[in-house]
UniProtKB/Swiss-Prot annotation:
Localization per Swiss-Prot or TrEMBL: Cytoplasm
CC terms in the record's Gene Ontology section: cytosol
Chain sites annotated for binding substrate: 54, 141, 157
Key word Chloroplast present: no
Protein name: Glutamate 5-kinase
Gene: proB
Alphabetical list of InterPro entries matching this protein: AceGlu_kinase-like_sf, Asp/Glu/Uridylate_kinase, G5K_ProB, Glu/AcGlu_kinase, Glu_5kinase, Glu_5kinase/COase_Synthase, Glutamate_5-kinase_CS
Keywords per UniProt: Amino-acid biosynthesis, ATP-binding, Cytoplasm, Kinase, Nucleotide-binding, Proline biosynthesis, Transferase
The EC number(s) this enzyme carries: 2.7.2.11
UniProt similarity note: Belongs to the glutamate 5-kinase family.
Residues that bind ATP: 14, 177-178, 219-225
Length: 269
């Protein structure tokens, strides 16, 4: 089953705020540098990668030296505007060191609702990838309240990453989180919880295992990851949920190693 991942040509990688920042909210430069190096190496293998990156608000909080996340929507959007600029500067610097060019793509939900805009976005992705450019995608937090309000919309970009996977016709979606995979109960509160290696169908029982919200640095929990898995697998895309603490895990996943939880695509449906 996992050996097929070796043949993945087009991959979407999603990293959340908790992967990109320390507990105190400051940017984890070492991890972003390693992530940039690993993705660059994957591209050097002849594969295409789209990076969906959260972290605009988290990085903005660190950049502005705020003690905590802002609470009002207008403050969050202002902080996101600062953070997105800083985040892209960091990505541009690190990917540039490995001779790769990146492009910023900021999306809002109306892209999905307007067929003309959707086609334009698809054409942009295709052109960037044809030219060997790595698209770095985020929701446009400065003008969109979907992720900020976290009302079952993109959800810390988990759902956005699945949607992007369908837009670019990806073979595989890899979501890097601060947890090793999908468990039958919360491993942070239940030491007897067991990680599921493969999920072939998202049943009501599986949904019940998802629990509630995620870490306090992001907005997505297991609920949004399951939602992303539904979108990806129903469109024939395998999804892997794994721990992003060491970005080199991406290489292992694409080598077909038994890492994280694999949500198996529904082929030919």
């Amino acid at each position: 089953m996992r050996k097929a991942l070796k043949d993945s040509k087009r991959i979407v990688v999603k990293v959340g705020t908790s992967t990109l920042t320390y507990e105190n909210g400051s940017v984890n430069l070492m991890r972003i540098e390693k992530l940039s190096r690993v993705i660059s190496d994957i591209c050097n293998m002849g594969k295409e990668v789209v990076l969906v990156s959260s972290g605009a608000i988290g990085v903005g909080v660190g950049k502005l030296r705020l003690e905590k996340k802002p609470e009002t929507i207008r403050e969050k959007q202002a902080v996101a505007a600062v953070g997105q600029c800083a985040l892209m500067h960091i990505y541009n610097k690190f990917f540039g060191e490995y001779s790769h060019v990146v492009a910023q793509v900021l999306l809002t939900r109306d892209v999905l609702e307007n067929e003309r805009m959707k086609n334009n976005v698809c054409n942009t992705f295709d052109t960037l990838l044809e030219k060997g450019i790595i698209p770095i995608v985020n929701e446009n937090d400065a003008i969109s309240i979907d992720e900020i309000q976290n009302i079952l919309n993109f959800g810390d970009n988990d759902n956005l990453s699945a949607i992007v996977s369908t837009l670019v016709n990806a073979d595989t979606l890899i979501i890097l989180s601060d947890i090793d995979g999908f468990y039958d109960s919360d491993p942070r509160t239940n030491e007897d919880s067991k990680m599921l290696k493969e999920v072939y169908e998202i049943t009501p029982e599986i949904e019940e295992c998802a629990g509630g919200a995620g870490s306090n640095r992001g907005t997505g929990g297991m609920v949004t990851k399951l939602s992303a898995a539904k979108v990806a697998t129903s469109n024939g895309i395998d999804m892997i949920l794994a721990n992003g603490e060491n970005p080199e895990i991406l290489i292992d996943i694409l080598n077909g190693e038994d890492i994280g939880t694999m949500f198996v695509a529904k082929k030919g449906e």
